[in-house]
């Protein structure tokens, strides 16, 4: 699941992973806010939610505020935070709150694909 309030993010992810999505290798859910992501994480079956990618800076509830809640509800699902601010303090806060990793924008989609592949292998 990708959590980001920017509408262009969904189009970008769908474009970057179009072959995988067309081939049915995995499904990609999108949530435009942290509260929607928490709701979807509670609804999605255990085996089908393998990774959450969340922007940090969102209106209302931030990704960092959502992080401990989603980790408590779904400890089986790693959360990777995405930010335009890759400073050491932001990374420390994200990891402290339970993030598996922190990616900085622009996103390295090749590295992200490797992470998704690893999660798919673990889920199989």
Model segments located where?
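A Lys-centered signature of the CheY-like receiver
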Residues: 105
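Acidic catalytic/metal-coordinating carboxylates
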Residues: 33-36, 62-65
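Receiver (REC) domain active-site loop signature in two-component systems and cognate sites
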Residues: 58
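Active-site beta3 strand of CheY-like receiver
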Residues: 46-53
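Receiver (REC) domain switch/output surface
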Residues: 112-124
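Conserved acidic segment of CheY-like receiver
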Residues: 1-18, 28-30, 34, 52
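Alpha4 helix (beta4-alpha4-beta5 surface) of REC/receiver domains from two-component response regulators
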Residues: 65, 72, 86-101, 114
């Amino acid at each position: 699941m990708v959590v980001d309030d920017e509408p262009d993010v969904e189009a970008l992810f769908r474009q970057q992973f179009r072959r995988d999505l067309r081939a049915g290798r995995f499904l990609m859910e999108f949530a435009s806010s942290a509260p929607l992501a928490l709701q979807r994480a509670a609804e999605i079956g255990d085996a089908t939610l393998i990774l959450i990618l969340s922007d940090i800076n969102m209106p209302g509830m931030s990704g960092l505020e959502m992080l401990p809640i989603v980790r408590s509800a779904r400890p089986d699902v790693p959360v990777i935070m995405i930010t335009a601010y890759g400073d050491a303090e932001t990374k420390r806060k994200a990891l402290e709150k339970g993030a598996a990793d922190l990616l900085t924008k622009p996103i390295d989609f090749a590295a992200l694909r490797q992470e998704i592949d690893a999660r798919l292998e673990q889920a199989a």
